């Protein structure tokens, strides 16, 4: 027997064991609709949503080494900030109420990128005065000045070496009292409003910012 859901929205019901003929018919139908054709791709209108996501093609660049990858990403970040400033700034007077919003990821992976951005800043290629940053995550409870903090290296390797305004640095506060965490998380989400460009890292299991595979795509900042 198998557990099935009533199409009319009623209670779950127990269905009888399907016949061999029905099973073969079902397999034939699934093979026709849900298998990848030889020429690649899927018939999207016939495939379940999870299969579409599983086989979707995401444009990906693979580099010989970290240096080449860092150069490519740094080029795109510098270009995006410059273009934004050309639109929102004139005569070097910045619209500080509307800075370029850069999302930062934590961990070891982006450190080479952060060092490259610092290098370019010191060479005069880019200014971060009209940039606001939002960090992806943080341990709890902890202070960002502690070496175990997820954001300690962001300060030491990046933020402390550029001309970003202190009020434009947004890091999840790991010192908020536990009974106020939910309220704080909601306010953090509200303060973000938008992200112009996000630097993101993906873990070995596919996790992003402590969001393990299977997390809701519309989930909010929260304690996990």
What are these regions (language model features)?
Residues 42-57, 126-199:
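Ligand-binding beta-strand-loop-alpha-helix segment within the catalytic cores
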Residues 113-115, 145, 209-211:
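Short glycine-/acidic-enriched loop or helix-start segments at secondary-structure transitions
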Residues 86-123:
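Glycine-rich N-terminal segment of FAD-binding domains in flavoprotein oxidoreductases
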Residues 108-109, 139, 204-207, 213:
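Short glycine-rich anion-binding loops that position phosphate/pyrophosphate groups of nucleotides
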